[in-house]
């Protein structure tokens, strides 16, 4: 596994962790936070995986 794919996986895992923490801490803002973080993580993961 090369560096780019590794970073993509790490960013994806961080997004999942962030979503879980957001749900536990502040459920009222979970949708807006998950959407913003999810888009960034998903785009990063897809772009880096295309190497």
Curated annotation (Swiss-Prot):
Keyword Transcription assigned: no
Keyword annotations from UniProtKB, A to Z: Antibiotic resistance, Host membrane, Membrane, Transmembrane, Transmembrane helix
Domain of life: Viruses
Keyword Cytoplasm among UniProt keywords: no
GO biological process: response to antibiotic
Location (main, coarse): host cell
Transmembrane segments: 6-26, 28-48
Outcome of gene disruption: Mutations in the gene confer resistance to acridine-inhibition of phage development.
Compartments (UniProt record): Host membrane
Protein name per the record: Uncharacterized protein 52.2
Organism name: Enterobacteria phage T4 (Bacteriophage T4)
């Amino acid at each position: 596994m090369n560096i780019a794919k590794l970073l993509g996986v790490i960013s994806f895992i961080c997004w999942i962790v962030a979503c879980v923490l957001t749900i536990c801490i502040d459920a009222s803002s979970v949708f807006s936070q998950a959407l913003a973080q999810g888009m960034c993580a998903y785009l990063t993961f897809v772009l880096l995986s295309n190497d």
